[in-house]
């Protein structure tokens, strides 16, 4: 009986504790409000990240953290790798406005896919009518202002290779019908109207697609056979996989703006119209 009473008392105590336990979470933006830290370029590491010695870490905001603290350890690791990261911090251009990754027919995806079409045509010597990439392959936005190499590398981190695929018009139409029904991806060279989940209109070069005509498609190897549930190479008349990665195509293109004295800028247009959603 005594043992039973002890067990009952213990269970009651646990019940009381479980009822009174409370946890709260506070969300802070990663804005450097504790330390004044900002993202460094290759030539401003002390100003952006602060300085460190054997005894303490002094942040850009003036706060001092002793050796052995968690902040000291994090700062030491971040500062130590900066020489290796210096090439990625190289300023390669200037963007006149922010370009957000907002799916198909946003300025950023249009900028990438339209250039990809040009580069695939240049590399393969084939006529390219349509371009196609997946939205998920674009990982971050392009900020306004100075653009560093890491902005592009972080945006396009995957080892996706440029490809050329020749498709008959009926297969190209089927590809866009599937995307309209599931999830439209980023494209160029076409005008698409979606009504609900149904492809209403597909124009290439301003004309309706001819089922028997062969069209050139610029894409990436990830989408050839099932990536993001897309099979661009299904029923391909011709397939060329290049040895050029998307990032290796886009970096020189981004740098070319500064070389000719221009700012990086692009636009959304009317290539995609969605009705009934």
Question: Model-found features: residue ranges?
Answer:
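Bacterial N-terminal signal peptides that target proteins for export
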Residues: 1-8
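Hydrophobic helical h-region of N-terminal Sec-dependent signal peptides
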Residues: 10-13
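C-terminal motif of bacterial Sec signal peptides marking the signal peptidase cleavage site
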Residues: 16-18
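Non-membrane alpha-helical secondary structure
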Residues: 66-70, 77-80, 108, 242, ...
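N-terminal, Lys/Arg- and Ser/Thr-rich interaction peptides
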Residues: 68-95
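Acidic/histidine-rich, surface-exposed loop or edge segments in extracytoplasmic proteins
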Residues: 85-103, 229-234
